[in-house]
From Swiss-Prot:
Its EC number is 2.1.2.9. It comes from the Bacteria. This is Methionyl-tRNA formyltransferase. Transmembrane segments: none annotated. CDD domains: FMT_core_Met-tRNA-FMT_N, Met_tRNA_FMT_C. Keywords: Protein biosynthesis, Transferase. Pfam families: Formyl_trans_C, Formyl_trans_N.
C-alpha cells in the first residue's frame, strides 16, 4: 500500500515511525511537512520540523509546504500515486488534494470526536476538566473534523498531566490506531460511524487573549487552565507590569494566616517558600513560573530573587 504521510509537530512523529516500521505492508512514498523555521540565533541554519527530522532519519522523501491549497502541491501528491493519505497534525487539506488517494485520506485527531473539534483538542480537554479523552481516526471531508469515524481509543487524563505530557501519551496511542486503521483499509474491512453533530464541542486555536489567566475563577478551574496550557504556549498574567507565565499551580488545601486585607482574586500573598494567589473560592500556590526576561523557575527559586518595592500596596496579578 502506497502512503503519503502529512504532519509537522512532535505529535505526528510516532505515527510516522510506526508506519515505517511495518514496511512489509506499507510503503511511505512521500512525507509532507511544514517548511523549516528560521532560528533566532544569528547565522544558524533553519530548524526542520520534528516530522522532517524523523523522515530524513528514516531515509524517506520529504516535501515541504505551507500552502496545501496550491496547484503545485496537488501535482506533487498526484505524482506520488498514493493509495492512502495519512494526516496527523497538519494543515487543512482541500478536496482537490485529499480526494487523490485511491482508498481515501484519513486524519488522526487528538480527541474523542465529535468532542473538541478544532486546532487545540489536547489543551481544551484539560482546561475543561475532562478526566478522559482519546484519539480518533476519521476519513477527511470538506468540513473540518466532521468526517466519518473509523476507530477511537480512550486515554485517561491523570491529575498531574499537563498538555505536553498528555500529547505524548496521545501520540503513542494514536500511532497504534493509525497502523490499525491502515490494516483495516488494506484488508477492505473498514466500517465507519457518522459523527453526531449534536454532541460536538469546539477546541479553538490558542491565542494571546484566550490563554490569559482570569483570576475571577475557581481554584480548580484555574489549575486546570494552567496545566492545559503547559508547557506551550503557557498561561500568562501580568505581575507589576511584566508578563508572568505560569506552568504549574495547585489549589491550597491547608489554612494559612492571612493579612488583614483578606483574599481577592489575583491578590498575591508571599511567605518564605510559597507564592499564593487569591481566587473566588480560595488560594492557589504557583509552583513553576517565568517572569518576562527570566528563565523558568520553581517557586522557591523565583522568590529568592523576587523584589516588590511597594510593600505598602497589595500586589495583584492582572
Amino acid at each position: 500500500m502506497r502512503i503519503v504521510f502529512m504532519g509537522t509537530p512532535d505529535f505526528a512523529v510516532p505515527s510516522l515511525q510506526r508506519i515505517a516500521s511495518e514496511n512489509h505492508d506499507f510503503e511511505i512514498v512521500l512525507v509532507v511537512t511544514g517548511r523549516d523555521k528560521p532560528r533566532r540565533k544569528k547565522n544558524a541554519l533553519p530548524e526542520p520540523t520534528p516530522v522532517k527530522q524523523s523522515a530524513l532519519e528514516l531515509g524517506l522523501p520529504v516535501y515541504e509546504t505551507d500552502d496545501p491549497s496550491s496547484a503545485e502541491f496537488a501535482s506533487v501528491v498526484l505524482a506520488s500515486r498514493p493509495d492512502v493519505i495519512v494526516v496527523a497534525a497538519f494543515r487543512i487539506l482541500p478536496p482537490a488534494v485529499f480526494s487523490i488517494a485511491r482508498l481515501g485520506a484519513f486524519n488522526l485527531h487528538a480527541s474523542l470526536l465529535p468532542a473538541y473539534r478544532g486546532a487545540a483538542p489536547i489543551n481544551w480537554a484539560i482546561i475543561r476538566g475532562e478526566k478522559v479523552t482519546g484519539v480518533t481516526t476519521f476519513f477527511l471531508q470538506e468540513k473540518v473534523d466532521t468526517g466519518s469515524m473509523i476507530l477511537t481509543e480512550n486515554v485517561t487524563i491523570a491529575e498531574d498531566d499537563n498538555a505536553t505530557r498528555l500529547a505524548e501519551k496521545l501520540s503513542v496511542k494514536g500511532a497504534a490506531l493509525v497502523v490499525e486503521t491502515l490494516h483495516l483499509i488494506n484488508a477492505g474491512n473498514v466500517s465507519v460511524k457518522k459523527q453526531d453533530d449534536s454532541l460536538a464541542s469546539k477546541a479553538p486555536k490558542l491565542t494571546k487573549e484566550n490563554t490569559r489567566i482570569r483570576w475571577n475563577s475557581r481554584s480548580a478551574e484555574l489549575c486546570d487552565f494552567i496545566r492545559g496550557l503547559a508547557m506551550k504556549p503557557a498561561a500568562w498574567t501580568t505581575m507589576d507590569g511584566k508578563t508572568l507565565k505560569v506552568y504549574k499551580a495547585v489549589p491550597l488545601e491547608s489554612p494559612i494566616s492571612l493579612p488583614e486585607r483578606g483574599r481577592e482574586p489575583g491578590l498575591v500573598y508571599i511567605d518564605d517558600s510559597r507564592l499564593l494567589v487569591g481566587t473566588v473560592d480560595g488560594w492557589i500556590s504557583l509552583q513553576q513560573l517565568q517572569l518576562e526576561g527570566k528563565k523558568i523557575m520553581e517557586a522557591q527559586e523565583f522568590l529568592r530573587g523576587f523584589r516588590y518595592e511597594n510593600r505598602e500596596q497589595p500586589l495583584l496579578l492582572l
